[in-house]
Amino acid sequence: MPRTRSDRGQRRAEIIQAATEVIAERGYRGATLSAVAERVGLTQQGLMHHFPTKEALLVAVLDARDQWDMASAALRGQAWPLDIVAELVEYNATRPGIVQAFTVLVGDSVTDGHPAQPHFRERYARVRAGGADALRAAYGDHLPGGLTPERAATLLIAAMDGLQIQWLLDPDSVDMPAAFRDFLALLAPPPAPGTP
């Protein structure tokens, strides 16, 4: 009996989950297609039927991570309020393998012709828009320093990505969640005159 589309979708979901686990255990470089294939009971060739390259599989893992992150925010009733963004940074501190895979892939994707480049262009456009919405909900059309939410969203993402890199390089010295909350505090309006 031929496999149905839902069977293939289920198998792809199993592969993505296995890849997420392998990345968490071994890191980006240690996560091989053969290790993922073994985890789901496939040959490497069988896995490559679903994901032809390691990059394609890792992009699918990152897509699944993004979907989960957005669904978690939606369950709380709003799309990306700033406190949930801070919680996401805190959660990322518990999954270094996924953060490492993201960082390596996004770095590689800046080269011409990289297969993940369209994915990351679209992702960053979507995340900038979501960040701008979160900032607009918190501050209105201008932040205390005068920036528009759109301009500030670019800085918000730069802070998140930059903190991830610093944390990956020196996790004992960089408290990523605390540093991100410090960044958000910089966006807060200045205290009213006469307030301590």
Residues covered by each model-derived region:
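Hydrophobic/aromatic-rich alpha-helical bundle segments in the mid-to-C-terminal region
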Residues: G113-E122, Y139-L187, P191-P196
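Hydrophobic alpha-helical connector segments
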Residues: A60, A71-V99, G145, P149-L156
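Helix-turn-helix
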Residues: R11-E14, A18-A60
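Actinobacteria-biased recognition of intrinsically disordered, low-complexity terminal regions
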Residues: M1-G9, P191-P196
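Short helix-capping/turn signature of helix-turn-helix
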Residues: F51, V104-D112
